[in-house]
């Protein structure tokens, strides 16, 4: 018999019905976090073109929602990788200028998978602001339920919050290297199985970081609704891979996006030692000195 459990931080996930009821609350601020990856073979060192979701946002969006542009406004412009976390002081300034801060409850949604919302959720989390939720099912679920949309653009006035930074959550290659042979650590690849096992060479060198396990991020999402699977189902997915709370768990993917969904679920299940490899395979697979395997 499966023992019912619940998400540890239930306020970090809101449903569409809740948002519809609270959409006119002046303390609620809603943000579309959508970004698109157009996969291409035109430049092997970068397997996709990044396309802002601003155009789609302007066509229609959840009423009273603003747009957050992950790559153009919230990523390190000096990095060779698409979504590198910027300096936290710069990130905090950018987010505050876009209206994130006290006393507001921030709602994040995306329209092509929850991972874009969870990426920005973690970016705000590492700054110490906790009044942030993702919309379960995102824009697709909102539309499926027949909820209203609009084209009017929203721009919130600046807000403020006291930063309590947790820079250790987003890690680099040295952390990953030290985790490979560490019996108290585990690496989780959030990409699809064909990439993990080397059939798909999207990121250059085929395969996965040596010793890492594969828990594709989409396995944590219901394929019909686009909503998160139940806490019981999510916990079983991790337990089936012998992931326990005493381990240091580092999540990676292609560019630090899908991994944030796995990390978000782990956090919601009460795991504490959670890390995200920021540049992931976009960095790792391009360096032949870093170990990878296909079995």
Regions found by a protein language model. Name each.
Residues 1-295:
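Cytosolic catalytic domains that perform sulfur/thiol-centered chemistry
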